């Protein structure tokens, strides 16, 4: 690391080496050369004066990029594409005259951007599938463990620890659907020329429109795409960047919601994120176990969600066939959206793979509230024994208010069960009430819902994507 210049936190702390490489100059310029080779091959196949020997020469130097030469040309030309055209030409003297034939800068620039986004989305998909697998394992393990539910962060009907985790899972499943959709519908720009009319290629092909269309089709096929944009200006529609970044923002929303839930649960001492043996939570308060990883997920997620506004503004501000005010913004915003979501998913996998659950705390909190929730069952049992429903309802209200005061005002334990057992109107004993207060009686279909969801939705996803499972993540704290 150079300590005398700015170093991006994405490189030093957040993004994986895999994602950093996808957005590296090396990946970019090697892709340029692959595109020039694909163009030359397609032009050869369609009858232009491009020889197989020239193509083989291009292929021989596809990966050994002469960066120093390109940099010298850029000082002279002030144009990155032409600098690399000339640098490539020095390595391929026989093919020099056909490199970039008929193309404009966006042929390599925009097509490379789409290829890069596809590669990055595939890495995102891999990590998303592993995140789903991690949470699914947790949900299955704890599907039967009752816990207090919360609405408005106030005590509500009980659920189970595993069922709560399925809410996180459902979000991720929806995100995976969106990633798959974007991957399935990505299109290359193709070979459209300076204003999208393919005029230069129409000239090369002596007015043959079908060959111009076939050129696009063959380039798409060679680069692994189903199609190119059927119409465009000089660039592909910048709305594509918005679609991709919105997809990443959806993942960020899911991860942020999870991190917020976990931070609240850690405060309640019910579930904690992993905490290393020698990890320090605070420089001042030695006892602290701060949820640093969850906080980082939340922090980076905000960045991705806000960053998605950049391509939206860029797409809306393009003039006619193109303007260059997109370039600097998209160069930063799209790359950093991917670098950030990559770091978020690494954290998500790391945290969910090592969640620490405290069953006794979970049970104690549930049991402190369960008597209030069981009052209707207790009342119905007393009515069956001959009690008056309206009278019993009023007594439960009074006992509940009194028990609530003991907890909130006096800081004592919930004594509602003792109060009801001591009231002859209910014709019951403490033992009979405690028999009603079995947490499993109050969780509804939570265990079954969890099991069904895992079996019917999650397992097929994991089976379909089993070749993506087993990712190793490294967290830089």
Region locations from a protein language model:
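A helix-coil-helix interface module used to build multimeric assemblies
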Residues: 2-220, 281-282, 292-296, 391, ...
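Short beta-alpha connecting loops at secondary-structure transitions
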Residues: 20-24, 69-71, 279-299, 321-336, ...
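Amphipathic alpha-helices that form helix-helix packing interfaces
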Residues: 39-42, 124, 128-131, 135-138, ...
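Glycine-rich cofactor-pocket loops
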Residues: 140-162, 272-288, 321-328, 353-373
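Short, well-ordered beta-strand elements within core beta-sheets of diverse protein domains
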Residues: 163, 242-250, 377-385
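Glycine-rich anion/phosphate-binding loop at the beta-strand->alpha-helix junction
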Residues: 175, 179, 226, 233-327, ...
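Active/binding-pocket-proximal capping segment
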Residues: 272, 395-402
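Long, amphipathic alpha-helical stalk/connector segments used for oligomerization, subunit docking
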Residues: 303-389, 395
């Amino acid at each position: 690391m150079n300590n005398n210049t700015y170093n991006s936190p994405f490189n030093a702390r957040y993004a994986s080496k895999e994602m950093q490489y996808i957005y590296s100059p090396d990946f970019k310029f090697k892709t340029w050369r692959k595109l020039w080779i694909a163009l030359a091959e397609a032009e050869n196949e369609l009858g232009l004066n491009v020889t197989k020997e020239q193509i083989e020469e291009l292929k021989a130097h596809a990966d050994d990029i002469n960066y120093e030469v390109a940099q010298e040309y850029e000082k002279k030309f002030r144009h990155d594409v032409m600098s690399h055209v000339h640098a490539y030409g020095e390595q391929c003297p026989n093919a020099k005259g056909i490199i970039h034939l008929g193309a404009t800068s966006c042929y390599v620039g925009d097509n490379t951007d789409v290829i890069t986004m596809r590669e990055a989305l595939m890495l995102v998909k891999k990590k998303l599938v592993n995140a789903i697998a991690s949470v699914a394992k947790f949900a299955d393990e704890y599907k039967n463990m009752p816990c207090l539910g919360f609405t408005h962060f106030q005590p509500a009907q009980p659920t189970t620890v595993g069922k709560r985790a399925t809410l996180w899972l459902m979000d991720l499943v929806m995100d995976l659907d969106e990633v798959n959709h974007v991957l399935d519908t990505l299109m290359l720009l193709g070979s459209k020329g300076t204003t999208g009319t393919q005029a230069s290629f129409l000239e090369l092909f002596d007015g043959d429109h079908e060959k111009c269309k076939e050129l696009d089709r063959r380039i798409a096929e060679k680069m692994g795409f189903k199609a190119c944009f059927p119409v465009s200006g000089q660039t592909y529609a910048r709305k594509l960047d918005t679609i991709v970044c919105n997809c990443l923002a959806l993942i960020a929303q899911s991860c942020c919601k999870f991190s917020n839930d976990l931070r609240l649960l850690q405060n309640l001492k019910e579930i904690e994120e992993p905490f290393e043996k020698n990890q320090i939570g605070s420089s001042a308060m030695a006892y602290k176990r701060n949820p640093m990883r969850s906080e980082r997920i939340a922090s980076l997620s905000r960045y991705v969600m806000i960053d998605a506004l950049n391509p939206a503004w860029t797409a809306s501000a393009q003039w006619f066939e193109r303007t260059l005010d997109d370039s600097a913004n998209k160069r930063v915003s799209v790359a950093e959206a991917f670098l950030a979501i990559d770091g978020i998913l690494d954290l998500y996998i790391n945290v969910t793979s090592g969640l620490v659950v405290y069953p006794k705390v979970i049970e104690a909190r549930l049991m402190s509230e369960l008597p209030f929730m069981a009052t209707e069952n207790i009342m119905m049992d007393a009515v069956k024994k001959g009690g008056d429903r309206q009278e019993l309802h009023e007594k439960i209200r009074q006992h509940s208010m009194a028990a609530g005061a003991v907890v909130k005002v006096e800081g004592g334990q919930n004594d509602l069960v003792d109060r009801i057992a001591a009231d002859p109107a209910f014709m019951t004993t403490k033992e009979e009430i405690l028999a009603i207060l079995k947490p499993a009686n109050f969780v509804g279909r939570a265990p079954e819902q969890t099991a069904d969801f895992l079996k019917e939705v999650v397992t097929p996803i994991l089976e379909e994507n089993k070749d993506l499972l087993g990712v190793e993540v490294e967290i830089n704290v």
